[in-house]
From Swiss-Prot:
GO terms of biological process kind: DNA modification; mismatch repair
Domain of life, source organism: Bacteria
Transmembrane segments: none
CDD domains per record: MutH-like
Lineage of producing organism: Bacteria, Pseudomonadati, Pseudomonadota, Gammaproteobacteria, Alteromonadales
Function field: Sequence-specific endonuclease that cleaves unmethylated GATC sequences. It is involved in DNA mismatch repair.
Species: Shewanella sp. (strain MR-4)
Keyword field contains S-adenosyl-L-methionine: no
Keyword Transcription: no
Family note: Belongs to the MutH family.
Name of the coding gene: mutH
InterPro entries, per the entry: DNA_mismatch_repair_MutH (IPR004230), DNA_rep_MutH/RE_typeII_Sau3AI (IPR011337), DNA_rep_MutH/T2_RE_sf (IPR037057), Restrct_endonuc-II-like (IPR011335)
Name of this chain's protein: DNA mismatch repair protein MutH
Location of this chain's protein in the cell: Cytoplasm
A cellular component term, taken from the record's GO annotations: cytoplasm
Keywords attached to this entry: Cytoplasm, DNA damage, DNA repair, Endonuclease, Hydrolase, Nuclease
Length: 223
């Protein structure tokens, strides 16, 4: 199986993404010689990885945009029959130490969300994984209001992390952006700032976009 050459420009990326619209995951997987899992319980990232592969994304799990040379992040988004997002969208790992002087403009969240190619995919559990179809892609850049909301949430969350209050942050914090434990294994630990300024061990955290925010983005395009 030959790796797909990354798209040379934005129009080539969008052309590839648009060509997938209406196609089932089984068709894409067969074309790439990949076995479709029975369900996604143990393969939660399978859909995203398949779409990344088909579009020629280069970043993998590196902390940079999927199409760094185009300044584009790729996000697959599972939707229901009404086009509503079924789950929050993972953005990146949250830094829990060495954050003094870190600004929104320099943050990985800001960098990743400057320009996103959203690829909706049918995600309702009653549809077999292989039968789920890819939807029409959306190239999105946050407008001033969306940037403001994201920045505001990020700054409030980072302030609480800096004050050693990471354990007090719940998924309810933030209007559009939330912080949640990242590891599937709750025994995974990393360092974070304690309230007295020392370091303590805690579960890794990740930034996620709330479904109300992604629903609003999809609604702006599809109504």
């Amino acid at each position: 199986m030959k790796p797909i050459i990354p798209p040379q420009n934005l129009s080539e990326l969008l052309e590839r993404a648009n060509m997938m619209a209406g196609i089932s995951l089984a068709q894409i997987a067969a074309h790439r010689g990949i076995t479709v899992p029975k369900d996604l319980k143990r393969d939660k990232g399978w859909v995203g990885q398949l779409i990344e592969m088909e579009l020629g994304a280069t970043a993998g799990s590196k902390p940079e945009q999927d199409f760094l040379h185009l300044g584009v992040e790729l996000k697959t988004i599972p939707i229901d029959s009404k086009g509503k997002p079924l789950e929050t969208t993972y953005v990146c790992v949250a830094p829990l130490t060495n954050i003094e002087g870190l600004t929104w403009q320099d943050s990985l969240v800001c960098h990743k969300l400057q320009r996103v190619l959203w690829v909706p995919v049918e995600g309702e559990r009653h549809i077999p994984v292989g039968d789920r179809r890819v939807g029409t892609p959306i190239l999105w850049e946050p407008d001033l209001q969306e940037q403001r909301l994201l920045q505001q949430d990020w700054e409030e969350i980072m302030e609480l992390i800096a004050l050693g209050k990471v354990e007090k942050l719940t998924a309810r914090h933030g209007e559009v952006l939330q912080l949640r434990p990242k590891a599937a294994n709750s025994k995974a630990l990393t360092q974070s700032i304690a309230e007295d300024g020392s370091l303590k061990m805690t579960n890794p955290r990740g930034f996620y976009l709330k479904t109300a925010f992604t629903a609003m983005l999809l609604n702006k395009v599809f109504g």
